[in-house]
Regions:
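Acidic, low-complexity intrinsically disordered segments
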Residues: 91-140
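A short, structured beta-strand/loop element
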Residues: 48, 52-93
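A short, terminal or domain-edge coil/loop segment
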Residues: 2-6, 19-20, 77-83, 121-132
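Intrinsically disordered, low-complexity regions
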Residues: 2, 20, 46, 81-84, ...
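Mature extracytoplasmic or otherwise solvent-exposed domains
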Residues: 35, 39-41, 55-56, 60, ...
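Intrinsically disordered, low-complexity segments enriched in small/polar residues
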Residues: 4, 24-25, 74, 86-90, ...
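Intrinsically disordered, low-complexity terminal tails and linkers in eukaryotic proteins, enriched
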Residues: 142-145
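Negatively charged, low-complexity tracts enriched in Asp/Glu with abundant Ser/Thr
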Residues: 1-61
């Protein structure tokens, strides 16, 4: 009598390749002193796996400064990080008013559209929080548009 043998798996002759996520990046100018920058990760099926960053950058004395950005790093949920002020580079993450449901592709499109539609509001808020006025010589003048 022959002993029963359990099913054995064939060893794969060609093991699966380790594929790292592809990062895509692009930016476009809203105006001469304001730009929108975004980057995202694609999975092996070329679908958006993560919104890495969608940011609004402003030019101050020939240097670009990010004043607000979105990412979906924490638990895949999109959230906004507004910069505190010109002197305080820390940010205050919030999900207030941010789209919460949808694919990463939809969240990316929403974040881009939000900055396109509200960039002036974000910039005015940054200027106000920075207490920028024409009398303050410590802060360079910031073009509104």
């Amino acid at each position: 009598m022959r002993p029963k043998l359990g099913k054995t798996r064939k060893k794969n002759k060609y093991p699966a390749k380790k594929v790292s996520a592809t990062v895509k990046h692009d930016d476009f100018y809203i105006s001469e002193n304001n730009r929108l920058t975004y980057s995202y990760k694609l999975d092996v099926k070329n679908k958006i796996a993560e919104v890495t960053c969608v940011s609004l950058d402003i030019k101050i004395q020939d240097e670009w400064m990010t004043i607000v950005y979105y990412d979906s790093y924490h638990e895949g949920q999109l959230h906004r990080h507004p910069r505190i002020s010109y002197f305080d580079p820390s940010d205050a993450p919030t999900m207030f008013g941010v789209k919460r449901k949808g694919s990463q592709n939809k969240l990316l499109r929403w974040a881009i559209k939000d900055i396109e539609n509200n960039w002036l509001v974000y910039k005015q808020g940054f200027i106000k929080r920075s207490n920028i006025s024409n009398n303050n010589t410590d802060i360079p003048e910031i073009e509104l548009y």
